[in-house]
């Protein structure tokens, strides 16, 4: 089955609306580059977190077959709720909207996991309170593509990100994001918490599919 070229379809629109983007390998979580007829890993993708995407980049990437689209986090923040319990996931989404604002940008990959998108008042690095992760500078999340586990397209059930401007998203600070993540972590049953020593630590260079 042929995967749509999301970059060709939506890349320029997202950039015009203020989103920093990067190419994602087909049916993958990974940023990629297309060279000599094949996709390869993109080692320096995190540089896109620190600057706007250029028109020339979008033109080049749009010719790469079956390219997905990632959002380079930093000025845009992803709140990743990596929870497969329907009730807990919905509860944490509600908490995020109370703490951080009622964002219209909610992305579903493997339901009931979900990711909420916000605008950073000032760019900041991401951090984890597993299974909650705040994705910031040096990280990315998938906006459009085929989820590698479900084989289905990522869904935006409220409003598609390509229909929004960055300015439409509620602005948040690192302090607000940390307060939310700490409160959300308390709501997660012990059985759903991964055994990890990284609670509250910065998470740099992450690749997230959701």
Predicted regions and their residues:
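Conserved phosphate/metal-binding and DNA-contacting active-site motifs used
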Residues: 1-209
